[in-house]
């Protein structure tokens, strides 16, 4: 068995003296593990850091075997990502989210979303938008997508400002007004008709509150898990970075 694919490094686990088990989210083959010989060497180590995109050749005698990876670097962004707090926390959290996907099950859209997020992670607020959207996409990919395109009560497609915490459906301003204190805010950057510009710190927190609730309910708690520490670390790092920027 042999295939070649591009993959984003999610993590690395030492195996023996100089080898390691590498976990990738690949474009065509999903989340996939393989053994890398010489992983601790000076040439390989920089390539195998979380957040990098690599070209992987996987070989195994049988498909169900762990197999071996031969790795070449494509986009080595890990050092830049790890140089700021929101980057370090963000990469760790994104890897934890990607691990929610079934192993060896192709998820090309999630690969593309992850790559796009990592390529546009320099500014803390923009990185936060990417992560909220990635969490939303993970929910949809696992069968728990939210309906944010029309009002659950009236069918309206405009002025959607709330989300029902029960159904996960959007609610318009007029329909939701009597129950506003029971509904979740829908941040502007998650509305299909609006772009990313002009979001506030509160919009970002509202986005994380929204996706966090449904991730816990539908994905994490049924697996006996909670949110990763990196998620809280990322949110705090973004808040601090934006506060510093506001003082400049």
Swiss-Prot record:
Membrane-spanning intervals of the chain: none
Described function: Involved in DNA repair and RecF pathway recombination.
SUPFAM superfamilies: ArfGap/RecO-like zinc finger, Nucleic acid-binding proteins
Cited InterPro entries: ARFGAP/RecO, DNA_rep/recomb_RecO_N, NA-bd_OB-fold, RecO, RecO_C
Name of the protein: DNA repair protein RecO
GO annotation terms (biological process): DNA recombination; double-strand break repair
Coiled-coil spans in chain: none
Record keywords, A-Z: DNA damage, DNA recombination, DNA repair
Protein family: Belongs to the RecO family.
GO cellular component term, pick one: bacterial nucleoid
């Amino acid at each position: 068995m042999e295939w070649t694919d591009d993959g984003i490094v999610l993590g690395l686990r030492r195996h023996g003296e100089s080898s390691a088990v590498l976990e990738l989210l690949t474009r065509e083959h999903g989340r996939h593990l393989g053994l890398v010989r010489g992983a601790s060497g000076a040439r390989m180590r920089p390539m195998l850091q979380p957040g990098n995109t690599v070209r992987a050749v996987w070989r195994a005698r049988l498909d169900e075997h762990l197999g071996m990876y031969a790795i070449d670097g494509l986009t080595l962004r890990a050092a830049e990502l790890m140089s700021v707090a929101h980057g370090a926390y963000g990469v760790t959290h994104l890897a934890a989210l990607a691990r929610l996907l079934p192993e060896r099950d192709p998820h090309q859209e999630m690969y593309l979303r992850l790559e796009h997020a990592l390529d546009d992670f320099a500014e803390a607020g923009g990185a936060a938008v990417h992560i909220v959207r990635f969490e939303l996409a993970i929910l949809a990919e696992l069968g728990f997508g939210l309906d944010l395109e029309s009002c659950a009560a009236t069918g309206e497609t405009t002025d959607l400002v709330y989300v029902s915490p029960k159904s996960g459906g959007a609610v318009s301003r007029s329909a939701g007004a009597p129950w506003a204190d029971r509904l979740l805010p829908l941040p502007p950057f998650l509305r299909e008709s609006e772009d990313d510009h002009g979001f506030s710190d509160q919009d970002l927190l509202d986005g994380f509150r929204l996706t966090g609730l449904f991730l816990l309910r539908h994905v994490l708690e049924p697996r006996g898990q909670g949110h990763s520490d990196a998620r809280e670390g990322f949110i705090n790092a973004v808040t601090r970075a934006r506060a510093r920027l506001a003082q400049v």
